[in-house]
Structures are given as structure tokens and as C-alpha cells.
């Protein structure tokens, strides 16, 4: 089953939005298989955003993600990477669907409350950065048979 990495950024944690955001993933039938509240250090932040090194927003993004705890999560489900992207909405909340997570809670492009993997390959890389294999739970979720054929 496909997995994706989701991070609730410092603004989501500080604004008390964690429960509301998790509820949206659960309501769509996604299965939570890993979660931790954590502080991101410089090395991890730089690894996470390595593809943006050299861009003007790299350093401010690294500093921001280290500024307060984040909630790192792994969700599992059918086409969960694409589903999560749809739930999150456009990166810039000004362009996001009003019903999406960013459309509902995001303040601006840098305070957009959530990060999600943009592909299966990115999900695998990001999950490996934040979780050891034994930290992910493999279980049968009650009611799974009602979610898809």
C-alpha cells in the first residue's frame, strides 16, 4: 500500500491545528502508520530541503522549520500521495481551494501549516529521513473494507 510523508509545520503546532488536520486525513480514509512530535535540527532540515539549496528561500525555510516543534507523520492508503496533495491544496494559500487545509488555515506561502511529499519517490526519501522502519506500524484498520473495493 502506498505511503506518504506529512509534516505539520511550526505554525500548525503553535496555532493548535494538529487535531483538525489529522481529522481531515482520517475522514478521507487514510491510515496513520507513524507519528511523532519532534524538534528538527539543522542537519535534518538541510537534508529535507536539500533540493532547494542555493535558492533564496532555502535558509529562511530551514530556520523556520527549526523554530518550533513539528508533527511528522506517515499516512498509508490507495493513491495516498495524490490524495494528500489534494487535501493540502496549493502551496500558496492564496491560490488554494478554500476547503483545503492550506485554504482553510494557511496564512501565506511560508506559513502554510503543512508539508506533504510530492511523489512516491519523495515520500520514500522523506519517510526515511524522519522514521526508522520499526517506528512504522503495520496493522489492519477497523472498517478498511468500507473504504474501497
Curated annotation (Swiss-Prot):
InterPro entries per UniProt: NDK-like_dom (IPR034907), NDK-like_dom_sf (IPR036850), Nucleoside_diP_kinase (IPR001564), Nucleoside_diP_kinase_AS (IPR023005)
Transmembrane segments: none
Organism: Desulfitobacterium hafniense (strain DSM 10664 / DCB-2)
Binding of ATP, residues: 9, 57, 85, 91, 102, 112
Catalytic residues, chain numbering: 115 (pros-phosphohistidine intermediate)
Main subcellular location of this protein, as a coarse class: cytoplasm
Requisite cofactors: Mg(2+)
An annotated Gene Ontology molecular function: ATP binding
Keywords: ATP-binding, Cytoplasm, Kinase, Magnesium, Metal-binding, Nucleotide metabolism, Nucleotide-binding, Phosphoprotein, Transferase
GO cellular component terms given for this protein: cytoplasm
Protein name: Nucleoside diphosphate kinase
Keyword Chloroplast appears in the UniProt entry: no
Main EC class the enzyme belongs to: transferase
Function: Major role in the synthesis of nucleoside triphosphates other than ATP. The ATP gamma phosphate is transferred to the NDP beta phosphate via a ping-pong mechanism, using a phosphorylated active-site intermediate.
PROSITE patterns (alphabetical): NDPK, NDPK_LIKE
HAMAP family according to UniProt: NDP_kinase
Reactions the enzyme catalyzes: a 2'-deoxyribonucleoside 5'-diphosphate + ATP = a 2'-deoxyribonucleoside 5'-triphosphate + ADP; a ribonucleoside 5'-diphosphate + ATP = a ribonucleoside 5'-triphosphate + ADP
